[in-house]
Structures are given as C-alpha cells and as structure tokens.
C-alpha cells in the first residue's frame, strides 16, 4: 500500500531577503527550518512514499522552497501553492502550475 501524506510544510530560514510574514500568520512549528532533504529522510523512516507540500503561512505567498523540492524530487513531492489571487501577476503563475 502506498502512503501519501496530504499536507506537509517545509520552510527555509528567515532572512532579510525572505522575511516571514507578520500579523495573522502562524509561527514556525519549530525554531529550526525543515528542508526537503530532512523531510525525505523522515518520509523514508515512516514509510511515506509521497507528499503534498503546502507552503506555510509564515512564508506568506512564497512557494519557492516547495517548488524547488518538487522540481528536484518530482516522484516524491507535489505542491499545493499559495497565490495572492487579488494580485494580477498571480494569473500568469497559474499557467505554469500544471503538474
């Protein structure tokens, strides 16, 4: 039986170039960011074959960390991205999100 986790968060460290969202956004689940390599080890240990990455709220509308993981490991990760639907530039992004 294949196990697929339907909601997993990975995130990068907060930096000046990529600050976390403020206000109503949640805070990270733990003080150390969770990257895709660590997640793959955890998935393998738990017998999870694939997962859907959902960018966390504290990364606002950024999807880059999750998209990069899916690009590197397309057989393991898919992304349910976050888009600011009120922004016109988000429409252009929709055309690239086919897989």
Where on the chain are the PLM-derived regions?
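Helix-coil boundary/capping segments in enzymes
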Residues: 1-99
């Amino acid at each position: 039986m294949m196990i697929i986790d339907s909601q997993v968060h990975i995130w990068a460290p907060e930096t000046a170039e990529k600050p976390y969202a403020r206000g109503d956004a949640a805070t990270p689940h733990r003080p150390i960011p969770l990257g895709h390599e660590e997640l793959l080890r955890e998935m393998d240990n738990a017998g999870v074959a694939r997962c859907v990455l959902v960018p966390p709220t504290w990364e606002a509308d950024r999807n880059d960390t999750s998209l990069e993981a899916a690009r590197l490991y397309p057989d393991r990760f898919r992304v349910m991205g976050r888009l600011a639907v009120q922004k016109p530039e988000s429409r252009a992004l929709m055309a690239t999100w086919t897989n």
